[in-house]
């Protein structure tokens, strides 16, 4: 019996480092504040691209990062009520002709001389509108407390098909954060 237990412990110890490496994006200082347009999120992400991802970007493969936000209200009689669910996609690419990295979201584009500068900008998410100023339609009210959740991930589904196949089960392509969950009391709306 002790031999069997020892075998299980060794297997568990072999798995733990893989689990630690799976969540490579850290989330710090998430905040929700009121603005003229509604409620916005500000958050800092901490991550680095591994050698394989750096090489892929430098050789022209576009990487798509997705920030996901959810806000729920607890209910005693059923599952929590999901009030808000938003996603924002960031496109990181390299242009060999200009030798610049480009970070895009929606119709906004910004160019950088180095990959580290582009990643620094990507790691600082500011003024992301998650709740429109007509918050009542979403079912949220200032002064009430809600559960907010946020994560960032590399979206391998938007990679070119050969890279999607190579990314399956490959930890080099698994760049994601755990959900950061916190309680937030919505401030009064800005005028």
Locations of regions flagged by a protein language model:
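Glycine-rich, aromatic-bearing surface loops/beta-hairpins
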Residues: 133, 137-191
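Structured domain cores in non-transmembrane regions
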Residues: 53-124
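Short N-terminal segments immediately surrounding and downstream of signal-peptide cleavage
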Residues: 23-40
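Bacterial N-terminal signal peptides that target proteins for export
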Residues: 1-12
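Signal that preferentially marks extracellular ectodomain short beta-strand elements
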Residues: 52-54, 124-141
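Short, well-ordered beta-strand segments enriched in hydrophobic/aromatic residues
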Residues: 39-49
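A short, structured loop/turn motif at beta-sheet edges
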Residues: 34-39, 94-99, 138-147
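N-terminal signal peptide c-region/cleavage motif recognized by signal peptidases
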Residues: 17-18, 22
